[in-house]
């Protein structure tokens, strides 16, 4: 059934699904069903927080990811036209505003600038723009980056809560906070701020638009259903696959801080 979901470059399959899959793996490793042995000490409180140890490698990784993402979003149009250029521009702006926001937040909190903050902010901005790159204008993209950085940075605190400790849920890569929750926010925000006019820049695409610019309130509900369905599909499917793999002799593991 075609509900008319707006997802320009794959926010659900790229971000929500990957975050759900990583979360399912972390929970399964703490509570294995079959051959793997349960760890009695695996909690977020006893694990060492992994920090980048090589700034040069992190910088090169950020340049590689950021540059590739520009081609990824712009290339989604499968053509070289004004819409592809617009997609590239909003992607770059959203990543930049996200990086700046995260750095400023960190500076206000700890009093120093951080390349790690720039990296995480850029990633959160790129995640925010993925489903909406072909549907929003430059000013909206700028605020998307700010929103994504603030939201994802606060979401990082979840793994240090009592809830995470009780579930022995560990997320060193911050996949749940950035990709999963950030992807959900991006998908929902696309339904709110998508614009018919921007989508038609290629002269072909027609969409009903979003809530605020085109008055299409129904689109918000569609986007929420899409985000929830994508998460549940990947989480349940991945958890089932992990359990089946755990049944195979030789594949069992002991969950630890690795």
Question: Could you tell me what each predicted segment is?
Answer:
Residues 1-258:
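Glycine- and aromatic-enriched membrane alpha-helices
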């Amino acid at each position: 059934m075609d509900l008319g979901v707006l997802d320009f470059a794959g926010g659900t399959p790229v971000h929500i699904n990957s975050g759900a899959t990583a979360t399912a793996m972390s929970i399964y490793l703490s509570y294995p069903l079959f051959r793997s042995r349960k760890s009695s000490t695996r909690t977020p409180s006893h694990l060492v927080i992994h920090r980048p140890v090589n700034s040069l490698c992190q910088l090169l990784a950020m340049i590689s990811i950021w540059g590739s993402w520009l081609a990824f979003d712009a290339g989604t149009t499968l053509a070289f036209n004004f819409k592809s250029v617009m997609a590239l521009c909003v992607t770059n702006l959203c990543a930049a505003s996200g990086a700046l926001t995260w750095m400023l937040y960190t500076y206000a909190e700890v009093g120093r600038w951080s390349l790690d903050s720039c990296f995480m902010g850029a990633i959160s901005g790129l995640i925010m723009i993925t489903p909406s790159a072909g549907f929003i204008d430059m000013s909206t993209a700028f605020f998307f980056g700010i929103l994504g950085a603030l939201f994802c940075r606060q979401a990082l605190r979840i793994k240090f809560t009592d809830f995470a400790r009780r579930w022995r849920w560990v997320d060193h890569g911050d996949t749940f906070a950035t990709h999963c929750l950030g992807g959900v926010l991006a998908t929902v925000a696309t339904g709110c701020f998508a614009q018919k006019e921007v989508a038609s820049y290629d002269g072909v695409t027609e969409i009903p638009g979003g809530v605020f610019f085109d008055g299409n309130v129904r689109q918000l509900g569609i986007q929420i259903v899409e985000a929830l369905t994508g998460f549940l599909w990947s989480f349940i499917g991945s958890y089932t696959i992990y359990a089946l793999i755990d049944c195979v002799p030789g594949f069992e593991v002991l969950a630890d801080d690795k």
